[in-house]
Amino acid sequence: MQRTEKYFEQDAFRTECESVILAAEPDEKTGAGRIALDGTVFYPEGGGQPADRGTLTLPDGTVLRVLDVHEQAGVIWHTVDALPAAAAPGAAVAGCIDWDWRFDKMQQHTGEHILSGILHQMFGAENVGFHVGTEAVRMDTSVPISPEGLRQAELAANRIVWQDVPVLISYPTREELAALVYRSKKEIEGQVRIVTIPGADVCACCGTHTRTTGQVGQIKILASENYKGGVRLSVVCGARALAAAQAMRARQADIGALLSAKADQTAVAVHRIYDEYTALKFTHFGLCGQLFDALAQLTAPDADAIRTLPGLDPDGLHRLAVRLTEATTGLCAALTPTEKGTGYCLARRDGDVRALTKALNAALNGRGGGKPGICQGSCAATPEQVERFLKENNKL
């Protein structure tokens, strides 16, 4: 089968084409299929960039939705939602890509080239992983980069955008390629396509790109994390960067309204509330300790002590159970009601509560465990039901 001519490599801004079907293969299970064309504007998935979407229109007016595009041995196959009889080899079709989808991918991909090139210049970082996702671009670097280093690289990358330099596509000869310094993620056979962004990057790439860096709009690093000896970045460009800025501004406005603070004072307000929370938490810790002491003092030395208190977190349950064991050699149980049932902590000073915990979990749909002298968990029963079970089975 003849190879498919790649119109998208000749002009990434071309949105339509008139083509001839080379082959059509049905999918018997779904009724859909795939179509190979002699030439196409549809970019096939590859190099970290998703495939184009759009439509193929047959001469009789039937419109087929293009759901995915892949290249196999130089032939580009278009996965379509239906494969009528008219979609046969030799038939003409009119292709049209989803331009908004394509331009978004162009902005993300060109922005990734700019940032990758800058990171390589500044830190010697290689791009060891790249994918244009539906929400952000994921980039993995080969070396660690500090937050301040990323801030400087982001600024340098955006300066390239502001300069609005041309994005150049070239096909160097073997001799020219041997003398060229360029980035490449893998060994490439055959003709190499070089994407050059003056001042930023020279890279082997088969993807679609903007004509100038200004069309990228903006490059914004949303997040970074240490990953396999380097950093993994979450990046957005163009319209996505604008949407991210608008969303962050809206969230900041919501937070400011809740805190009765101006936008530039939300961090100060949050710190103030955090300090107040820390002080209240310390006070609460002390008051709980006093309450636990009082409950322990009301417990006879050899009696079972089953106490239910609302609002206890796991640490509070543990503290209460331990305090009760200091007052009695009997079974000690701290219980608190939860949305889904009861949180519990069982303890015995000189005994083993694991068998009792296992029985409780089995009987009351619970989960939990621990050491011989103390076990903790939760179950799908009320505190009253748990207390009744413990009184009936406390000899386990």
Walk through the language-model features, giving the residues of each:
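A glycine- and charged-residue-rich anion-binding loop/surface
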Residues: 1-396
